[in-house]
Amino acid sequence: MTGLQLFWFIIVGVLFSGFFFLEGFDYGVGMSAITVAKDKREVEQAIGSIGPVWDLNEVWLLTAGGAMFASFPYWYASLFSGFYLILFLILVGLIFRGVTFEFRHHSHTEKGKMIWTKVLGVASFAIPFLFGLMFTGMIQGVPMDAKGNVTATFTTYVNFLSVVGGVAVMLLAWLHGLNYLALKTDGDLRKKNKKIA
């Protein structure tokens, strides 16, 4: 590995780490909105705590993907072709999660807000789980041919260890969100998050 490759590898690693550090509490707050928050005021307080920052944090993912594409195009191509289904589901989750913030805001009924809050929670659980599933699969290794194409099937990279990795990343994001809410909120919601964390 040359010095330039090492430099870009570190940059991509820092960008993905920044994404998981900054976006992790967003996912955790979304999870807490459907599990810890029990009434309308607590849900609004939880979601309002990430309102100004959630979309900015996703820029780290775009930058990491762009840096990976620019510096390691074969890695990028193998990743996207080999983990196509998981990345597609992550993209669907990111779309639903982003739309949820706007649709909750413009929903005029309590039932509509409740539905979009549940969509936010489900997407917030699914996205870190799928990222953990994918990264654990990458760490385990996936079969590739001589041209760098991934020859794995769905069951090759979705196994017991990768599911454990997905659950671990999901729980880590939830813990991150619980701690964030314990710092940024007050009243009963703060006490509940502090107790669970």
Label every PLM stretch briefly:
Residues 1-12, 69-84, 136-162:
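Helix-coil boundary and interhelical linker segments in multi-pass alpha-helical membrane proteins
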Residues 8-19, 80-93, 121-125, 156-171:
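Alpha-helical transmembrane segments
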Residues 103-197:
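Long, contiguous internal "core" modules enriched in hydrophobic/ aromatic residues
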Residues 1-56, 62-65:
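N-terminal signal-anchor module of multipass membrane proteins
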Residues 1, 41, 48, 74-81, ...:
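Membrane-helix interfacial "entry" motifs
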Residues 22-32, 91-103, 171-181:
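Membrane-water interface of transmembrane alpha-helices
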Residues 53-124, 145:
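Membrane-interface helix-loop-helix modules in multi-pass inner-membrane proteins
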